[in-house]
Amino acid sequence: MKNLIFLFFSIFITSLAFCQNTSETKNASQDIINLISSYSTSRDTKDTVLLKKILTKDIDQLVSSGVWRKGIAQAVQGMMESSTSNPGDRTLKVESIRFLNPNVALVDARYEIKNEDGTVRKMWSTFAVVSEKEQWKISAIRNMLPAGN
């Protein structure tokens, strides 16, 4: 009987742990979606203060043209130059979030820029995001063109 009670208790405790992780993952997922939305907003409004708040100091970015931006200063400068030279409405739609551990996730998003002439540039973006002091930040960005473009 003791073994049966122990088994039941073990299963119950394990299920509680998984329920908590699911709830935490849902909360973290929403925080990450909000982070990507803030990134999009900061690019559209050219808000460097917001960008510096949501990017890690050692961020690196590989843009679709093959150019690397390393470090927050280079990344912010390049993002502002790109937003100015490639105007249009930017849309980032998160397609998937994969947690590598509770503090690191990979985020895949569809990235579209609607140009002033009505054409749409369609790309993919992958973000590596990390939780620093209970705030999610972008640590790396990879922009790529889909095959066939």
Each language-model region and where it sits:
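A short gly/proline-enriched turn/hairpin at secondary-structure junctions
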Residues: I59-K70, E81-S85
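Solvent-exposed loop/turn segments at secondary-structure junctions
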Residues: G66-R69, I113-K114, M144-P146
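Surface-exposed, charged secondary-structure patches
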Residues: V76-D117
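A mature extracytoplasmic/lumenal domain signature
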Residues: L55, S65, S96-R98, N103, ...
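Short, low-complexity N-terminal intrinsically disordered segments enriched in polar/charged residues
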Residues: F18-K53, K57
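Short beta-strand edge/turn micro-motifs at domain boundaries
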Residues: K122-N149
